[in-house]
Amino acid sequence: MKNKIEELPIEVKPLEGYLLYIKFKNNEEKIYDMKEMLKFDYYKNLRNKENFKKVKVYGITLKWSTGEDIAPEKIYFNSIPLNDYKFEIKEMN
């Protein structure tokens, strides 16, 4: 397992299709697909694109203005390296 400090997000951008672009402290860039998470009631406010777009790096994790957050290990270990992502990536409008 990598050092947790390397797994910390330092930048996040919401993308079309409820994806997140995340850059980590170790300079890895990854894509995290939030669609499965949106099925849970905890994340129901993020089904609204305007709410989803309001994601920020907050301390060691990602957090939305509506209060939801997600563990850094979850996004790190369940995301796809940017270079391996085979689909079109568009910033969310």
Enumerate the language-model features and the residues they cover.
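Motif-centric detector for short Cys/His coordination patterns
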Residues: 1-93
